[in-house]
Structure formats: C-alpha cells, structure tokens
Amino acid sequence: MAMSSLKSRVTLLLNWYTNPYHTPILVAQQLGFYSEEDIKLAILEPADPSDVTEIVGLGTVDFGVKAMIHTVAAKAKGYPVTSIGTLLDEPPTGLIALKSSGINSFQDIVGKRVGYIGEFGKKIIDDLASLAGIDPTSYKTVRIGMNVTDAIYRDVIDTGIGFINFQKVELEHLCGETVFLRIDQLAGLGCCCFCSIQFIVPEITLQQPELVKGFLRATQRGAAYTTEKPEEAYELLCQAKPQLRTPLYQKIFTRTLPFFSRTLINVDRDWDKVGRYTKHLKIIDEHFDISQCYTNRFLPDTPYSDLKPIACCLEN
C-alpha cells in the first residue's frame, strides 16, 4: 500500500503516563468521538515529562497536555504554544508528607528534604521560604520529577509537591496518614489555577482551525460523558489501559472527578492570576501579555447534544 493512501494520524502527547486524569480523552477515543470528527488520534506518552512543551512548541506533535504554569513559561521562552482548552480545572496542589515526618506547617521544612517536579517547583518553594523568613540553606531541595510518592516511600525526600487527587492518594495507599499543605493557600492565590492542566498546540496546528474544532468537540463530549457517567467512563478507561483497573487508580479517578472541566474553557480569571504569580516568581517579565497564551475561539458554541432542539429560546 502506498504511503499516500494511508489516512494520516493526528498526534496527542500527554504530560505523563496515561492515568485517570486523562479519562475524557480515552473515553472520547473508546467511544469513537474523534473518529466521528474524522480524526485518527494517536495518543503518546513522554519518556520525560519535562520535554513536552518543547516537543509541542517545535511542532513535532499536533496536540499536547501540560500545566498552565509550564505553558506560560514555554511561551515566555519563545516556544509558539497556545492553550486551546482546559482538561483539569484547579486540582489542589501542595506539599505532601507523611504525618510521621513531623511536617505540619510550612515552617517545618527546616532541616528537611523537599522534592519538586521541575524548575518552577523549586522557585515556588524558595519564594515561599523567603517570604516566611526561612534561611534557604536550612532545607534541601531535590528534583524528583513527577514521582513524588515513590521518592517519599524510598526516603529520598521528606516532602514534595503533588496533586491532592493523585500523589496524596498514592502515598496514603502505600504508607498511611498524610499531611497536605496547599500552595495556593500558602501563596494567597485564592485558587490552584497554576496547576490546571491545559490542551496546548503549536502554531502549525492553530493554522488548521477545523482540526482544532473537531478535536475539542470530541474531547468535550468525552468530558461530559466522564462527569455524567463516571462508572461507565472508568470502565472505558480500564478497557483502554487494563493496568489502571486497581482499587488505587479507581480511588484516584473518583477523587479527580470534581476537577474535570466539562466545557474545556480557558478561564480568564485563572490565566490572569497565573500571569501575576509568574511575574512575582520572575518566570516572565512585567511586559509579558498573558492573553497571548490561550484562546477560546475554537471551542463549541454549545455542548454536543443527542437531541435536536425544538427551538432556540435565546433568539431575539
């Protein structure tokens, strides 16, 4: 068969290994929603999660998944990436530790090993320590990537940054009672938007509006199905990835349900707060325009419906 006769695939690079917070994507794939949009989607996992924004920015893949703060940083570095929608809205993020560690407040990091995911995690920890009057030489920061739970379990660190609906659940499952110190509360942000998980695209994908609109229509249907029929959605996830059929992952799925975005909308308020916070952390400069990081123009005007409307009651 000639290569030209093969239907081209559309690529989506996840931010980590496939897990319950990717459920809307897997549901849309399993139920054929992407196929109905004439999208043959190849879902890829990164060998190193820190490579995702660069790979997307270079146009090597069509779509990617990444946290809001990393999307802002990538744009500031010159990578042409844009958020076209939201997968997870404000999953609470914070320092996780075992209760037996003796860490009950942020001041208790003195003399401890503090794990962080990437360069911005260290900036956040050091900034909070500075504001709290903690000597930066009195604690040790350790880059451990996304595997916070394993690092605590192996006694590599005493505490580390993670999601309340994921790493905290993992650590409780492995080791028992935990402590969770929310970063948004420590930093007075009023929301945990900096770790919202976004769908990001390179410039070349933005130039294909029908592809982007079709991807978002299908994904929005997957998100609606996930929140409306969680038991069926989890079953579809497990059919796609049988290794996720465990009590632990089922609990992570249940804890993640409140944070799935049904509309996929980029929330202006959240981007504004993240813009101000990243300026405070000196990740971006004062002249950086946060509005260039995201767009809602490709999202459906109304959610998908199996029912044909009797009339449009909003018309004049």
From Swiss-Prot:
Keywords: Iron, Metal-binding, Pyridoxal phosphate, Thiamine biosynthesis, Transferase. Pyridoxal 5'-phosphate binds at residues 118-121. It catalyses: N(6)-(pyridoxal phosphate)-L-lysyl-[4-amino-5-hydroxymethyl-2-methylpyrimidine phosphate synthase] + L-histidyl-[4-amino-5-hydroxymethyl-2-methylpyrimidine phosphate synthase] + 2 Fe(3+) + 4 H2O = L-lysyl-[4-amino-5-hydroxymethyl-2-methylpyrimidine phosphate synthase] + (2S)-2-amino-5-hydroxy-4-oxopentanoyl-[4-amino-5-hydroxymethyl-2-methylpyrimidine phosphate synthase] + 4-amino-2-methyl-5-(phosphooxymethyl)pyrimidine + 3-oxopropanoate + 2 Fe(2+) + 2 H(+). Its EC number is 2.-.-.-. Its cofactor is Fe cation. A motif (CCCFC) lies at residues 191-195. The active site is at 70. The modification N6-(pyridoxal phosphate)lysine is found at residue 66. Changing residue 120 to A: Decreases catalytic activity. One of its GO terms (biological process) is thiamine biosynthetic process. GO terms for molecular function: 4-amino-5-hydroxymethyl-2-methylpyrimidine phosphate synthase activity from histidine and PLP; metal ion binding; vitamin B6 binding. Pathway: Cofactor biosynthesis; thiamine diphosphate biosynthesis. Homodimer. Belongs to the NMT1/THI5 family. This is 4-amino-5-hydroxymethyl-2-methylpyrimidine phosphate synthase. It comes from Legionella pneumophila subsp. pneumophila (strain Philadelphia 1 / ATCC 33152 / DSM 7513). The lineage of its organism: Bacteria, Pseudomonadati, Pseudomonadota, Gammaproteobacteria, Legionellales.
